[in-house]
Amino acid sequence: MGRIGISCLFPASWHFSISPVGCPRILNTNLRQIMVISVLAAAVSLLYFSVVIIRNKYGRLTRDKKFQRYLARVTDIEATDTNNPNVNYGIVVDCGSSGSRVFVYCWPRHNGNPHDLLDIRQMRDKNRKPVVMKIKPGISEFATSPEKVSDYISPLLNFAAEHVPRAKHKETPLYILCTAGMRILPESQQKAILEDLLTDIPVHFDFLFSDSHAEVISGKQEGVYAWIGINFVLGRFEHIEDDDEAVVEVNIPGSESSEAIVRKRTAGILDMGGVSTQIAYEVPKTVSFASSQQEEVAKNLLAEFNLGCDVHQTEHVYRVYVATFLGFGGNAARQRYEDRIFANTIQKNRLLGKQTGLTPDMPYLDPCLPLDIKDEIQQNGQTIYLRGTGDFDLCRETIQPFMNKTNETQTSLNGVYQPPIHFQNSEFYGFSEFYYCTEDVLRMGGDYNAAKFTKAAKDYCATKWSILRERFDRGLYASHADLHRLKYQCFKSAWMFEVFHRGFSFPVNYKSLKTALQVYDKEVQWTLGAILYRTRFLPLRDIQQEAFRASHTHWRGVSFVYNHYLFSGCFLVVLLAILLYLLRLRRIHRRTPRSSSAAALWMEEGLPAQNAPGTL
């Protein structure tokens, strides 16, 4: 039996031989089957290596990003590592009407991707507490003595200087931003206060502090900063990574392209304080106006800005509507309501000769107070006595005229222009009174449900005051709920409901409002949005440095890709060599029996075999 030696290109010690009988299947396989098997083997091999490369490259990146987001939330409550030279710092002083607060922020080195924002977070001291300090009174109290402002604010700056590493002072930006209290001052007094700050602070502190770093910001700016801060903490400025993330189509303001882009849906904010109410949300689509007058008003309410570090990139360009309504806060609204009761009651008594509200025995019946509670309104030396009837529906009806709604389309409170909201694809967060009204007493903060809220509010209003006091004494309400909250909860519930549904025109079946005090267990201040916006160009420095390093390490990436292609090519060459060798074996196997048969035939005829192997 013949044997076939296989040596190929292997070393001599690897040479071996096989018998055709021992491997009949391989040698008897037809050409088409061999070709199909070989092609399939090559395809499977290439597919395998492609999957391995893609999983290693992109799968790891996705896992790393998810892990980094989780890690960021965990480390966000850890003490800031002040020994890390790659940590940068920023300081914002919020000069409000009742006092001033300093916030110290920090962020690691930018990752070099021009599409990503700085990862700014609040600095935490050795005890893991946020680096914040507040002083009183408000800065506007120094309107007549501006030369004392620097001394007034020095304790805040000294506090910040103690926490920011000394070596970082000269590269740490300082922003002093004044809000409501300063807005009401004459421009000359505002200028004198800011001038004193700009003159004295650089003498005593080494922070980055230029003329544009101290200013009185408008209510619109404050609202935009608050919107930026909330959405940054929610991660709405990040790239889309999961298919289940809420997205929205956006027409980029100022873009030459008319095509809409798809990006993460941002959240709107509703904030009802004691004096005012504010709404802010992104307007993703280009808006139209009912009149030229409405267009002029809209220009003052719409803000277009770029959060990215490259002004030519439109990925982080946003169009945000911001409107602030003075007198529509919870306490201010109650005051307006009582003023109306007082004026109307005095006038009716005078015209009709009645004594309503003038004595405790003949009180004015107030549907917006809990059942049987007694209260008083005192103005100009006169007193109007009230007694609650706890009628939530009547209370809502009574306060509806205070919305000052008009018949004009696309308007809200006081007839102010409001762009359309896509209620089926939107999300809002309600802060301050929106949260207090739903949580402090009713204990239903979080996801808002109009039907459940109105039922709970009706039940509360219709409950006797004596029972409410008993529940309060037993500690059944939130720890920070006081008697003032209990007394005016009925009114504020009705006011919040009317502002939200009638004033801002949210449908009663709207399910995407979340009332909250904090976001991810953090109280988000507008100052976070302010420093995000004002430091947006700082990543350019890190991006340039990253590009320089990348140019020196580019060959590594090229080598990595080249090696994979080289390996695949070698694999195909070896596979082709094996295929050709098998074909050669098959031809030899077929020719050998044919030659043997011919030689035997010649021998049987007694003739010499022609061209037989081994003959001359």
From Swiss-Prot:
GO terms for cellular component: autophagosome membrane; cytoplasmic vesicle; Golgi apparatus; Golgi membrane; lysosomal membrane; membrane. The chain crosses the membrane at residues 34-54, 560-580. Its EC number is 3.6.1.15, 3.6.1.6, 3.6.1.42. Changing I341V: Found in a renal cell carcinoma case; somatic mutation. It is an enzyme of class 3 (hydrolase). It comes from the Eukaryota. This is Ectonucleoside triphosphate diphosphohydrolase 4. The lineage of its organism: Eukaryota, Metazoa, Chordata, Craniata, Vertebrata.
